[in-house]
C-alpha cells in the first residue's frame, strides 16, 4: 500500500489493525490518532486506488467528525510550541547533550555499556531532539508524541552525525492510549510530559503496560512551589482560555518582560534562571501558561503509583525548584516476589554513567 519509499523507508501508506481501524503514514510518520485519516485525507485518498474496492470503502467509512476523543487542545498548543522551536535552541534553558545526561543517563541506573540494543520509548518526545540523540547510545527509540512537532526530528538527524536514523521511529499518537503492544520496551522516558495530560496517574498506568519485565520507567513532573504555583495557576485561568494561536502571539510579545523578570530574580538571588534567548523565553511561556493541563505532584504520591503498578524499586532524581524526577524498575520474572523498596542513594549504573561523562 506504500506509495513511495526513500532508502527503504515507507513515506506514505495505510495501516490497519485487527479491529478494522485505519491509520495513515504521512512523511514517514505513522499517524495513530482517531482523526488522522480526516486530517491527512489529501495524502490518503490517492492510496485508495491500490486497495480492493471493499477495503477502500472501509477507509472512507473511517472518516467521521466523531472519530474519537483525545486532547485536541493540548495537541494544538504543543504543535505550535514545537513549530516555533528552532534547531539549536535550548529546552528549559539546557543544551541537548546536558539534557541527555541529566534526564536519561543519570536517573535510569542502567550502565551505558548495557544500553545498545535496548528499546526506549520516548513518551512525549516533543520535537524529537533527545530521541535522535539517544540513538548515539545504541538505543532503538520509539519517539511518540501527540503534537506534529516530532516532524522536526529529521532536522536533528542532519545535525547529529553520530545519530543512527535506522534506530529512531517517530509515531504521532496519544500517550493516554499508546499504540504499542504490551511488554515491548525496556525503558520508558517521559520528562515534563505526563503532568500535561488530563490524568497524570491514568496516563502513567497505561504506559506501564508496554514495559517489559525488568524494565525501567523514568518520569519528571511539576511539584507545588510555595506561593509561586498559586500565582501561576491563577494566571493560567486566563491564558488557557485563549486560542492557542492567540496565546502563542502573546507569549512572543511577553518574552522580553519575562527575560527582564528573570534577570532581576537572578540579580537579587531569588532564583537562578539559566540565560535564554527571546525565542526560548517565549517557548517557556507557551509551556507554562499555554498548556491546558499542568498538574503538580509529589515524590511520595508518585512512589505509591510505582508500587501499585508492581515496581519493586523506585528512587528520586532531578529534584529542583520546579519539579522532581522519579525512576522505578519492574521485577524480572524471577524477581517477581521481591518486596517494594524506595532507594535514596544512586544505583551502581548511575555512578558508572557519571564516571563516563
Residue ranges, per PLM feature:
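Conserved class I S-adenosyl-L-methionine
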Residues: 216-247, 256-263
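Conserved N-terminal segment of class I S-adenosyl-L-methionine
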Residues: 1-121, 125-179, 187, 294-295, ...
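A short linear hydrophobic-aromatic micro-motif
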Residues: 312-316
Amino acid at each position: 500500500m506504500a506509495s513511495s519509499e526513500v532508502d527503504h523507508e515507507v513515506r506514505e501508506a495505510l495501516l490497519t489493525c485487527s479491529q478494522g481501524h485505519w491509520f495513515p503514514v504521512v512523511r514517514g510518520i505513522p499517524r495513530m490518532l482517531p482523526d488522522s485519516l480526516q486530517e491527512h485525507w489529501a495524502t490518503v485518498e490517492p492510496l485508495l486506488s491500490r486497495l480492493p474496492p471493499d477495503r477502500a470503502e472501509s477507509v472512507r467509512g473511517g472518516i467521521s467528525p466523531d472519530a474519537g476523543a483525545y486532547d485536541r487542545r493540548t495537541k494544538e498548543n504543543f504543535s505550535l510550541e514545537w513549530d516555533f522551536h528552532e534547531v539549536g535552541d535550548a529546552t528549559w534553558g539546557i543544551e541537548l547533550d546536558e539534557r541527555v545526561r541529566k534526564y536519561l543517563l543519570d536517573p535510569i541506573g542502567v550502565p551505558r555499556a548495557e544500553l545498545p540494543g535496548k528499546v526506549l520509548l520516548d513518551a512525549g518526545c516533543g520535537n524529537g531532539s533527545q530521541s535522535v540523540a539517544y540513538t548515539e547510545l545504541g538505543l532503538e527509540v520509539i519517539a511518540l508524541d501527540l503534537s506534529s512537532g516530532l516532524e522536526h526530528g529529521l532536522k536533528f538527524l542532519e545535525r547529529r552525525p553520530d545519530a543512527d536514523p535506522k534506530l529512531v521511529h517517530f509515531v504521532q499518537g496519544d500517550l493516554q492510549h499508546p499504540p504499542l503492544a504490551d511488554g515491548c520496551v525496556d525503558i520508558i522516558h517521559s520528562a515534563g510530559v505526563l503532568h500535561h495530560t488530563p490524568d497524570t496517574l491514568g496516563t502513567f498506568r497505561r504506559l506501564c503496560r508496554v514495559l517489559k519485565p525488568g524494565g525501567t520507567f523514568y518520569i519528571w513532573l511539576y511539584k507545588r512551589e510555595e506561593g509561586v504555583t498559586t500565582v501561576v495557576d491563577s494566571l493560567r485561568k486566563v491564558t488557557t482560555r485563549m486560542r492557542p494561536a492567540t496565546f502563542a502571539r502573546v507569549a512572543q510579545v511577553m518574552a522580553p518582560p519575562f527575560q527582564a523578570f528573570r534577570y532581576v530574580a537572578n540579580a537579587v538571588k531569588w532564583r537562578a534562571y539559566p540565560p535564554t534567548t527571546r525565542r526560548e523565553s517565549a517557548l517557556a511561556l507557551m509551556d507554562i501558561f499555554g498548556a491546558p493541563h499542568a498538574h503538580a505532584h509529589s515524590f511520595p504520591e508518585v512512589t505509591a503509583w510505582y508500587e501499585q503498578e508492581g515496581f519493586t524499586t523506585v528512587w528520586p532524581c532531578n529534584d529542583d525548584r520546579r519539579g522532581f524526577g522519579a525512576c522505578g524498575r519492574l521485577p524480572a520474572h524471577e524477581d517477581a516476589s521481591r518486596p517494594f523498596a524506595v532507594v535514596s542513594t544512586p544505583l551502581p549504573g548511575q555512578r558508572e554513567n557519571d564516571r563516563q561523562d
